Amino acid sequence: LADSDEGIINYSLQTIPDAPIYDIDGNYATIVREGYTNPNPIALAMLDDILLGRQKLTGNIFFDITPFENLTWRTELGYDISSSKADRYKPMVDLGGWKRSSNESGVQKNSSTFWQFKNYLTYNGNIDDHYFTAMVGQEAWESRYDFTSIFNTGLPSDEVHNPALGTGTPTINSGFGSSAMVSVFTRLTYNYADRYLGTYTYR
């Protein structure tokens, strides 16, 4: 949405500090000097439509069960589901020294999902001053994402922001991907009278 070198943020950083926002007639001003021409970033911020909508659902569910004394089973389920839609429309603009001769419109949609499932089985015990803990576990997760975008120029009206109606050459992009992992692990800890400690972990 920042539009790289032609975005509002970049133009704002490059605008000289004494540049006026409006001219004497109350219109948006553009400063043209020798070796320097930059559009009015305030004008672009007010005239361009840049919208980003996001939806997100995330959470974590867990429970502990103690079937026997000193033995605990813990299960965790986590998830994250998100989607977003970015709409960008730039109308034709004439700021005197700077012009945008063609309008342009772009839409991008993104979605992603993530889930994680864990199980732990832990046993705590002791014999006199010898304390020990044994744990075995399993973990699995998966992540997926996809996106589509379309961009075009030369729309017939500023009222309808639909790239499919543009007379220019449309630019269409899409992509997707996924990753996953499954692992098992164990951990042993030993404590003698709070004087000697030892831990062993394997995944």
Q: Where are the regions a protein language model picked out?
A:
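Membrane-spanning beta-strand positions in outer-membrane beta-barrel proteins
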Residues: 62, 66, 72-76, 131-135, ...
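Outer-membrane beta-barrel channels and translocator barrels
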Residues: 66-68, 126-128, 193
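Generic recognition of flexible, low-complexity loop/linker segments
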Residues: 61, 123, 185-187
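Surface-exposed loop/interface segments of Gram-negative outer-membrane beta-barrel transport/assembly proteins
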Residues: 1-56, 74-183
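Extended, hydrophobic alpha-helical segments in both membrane/secreted and soluble proteins
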Residues: 75, 117, 182-188, 192, ...
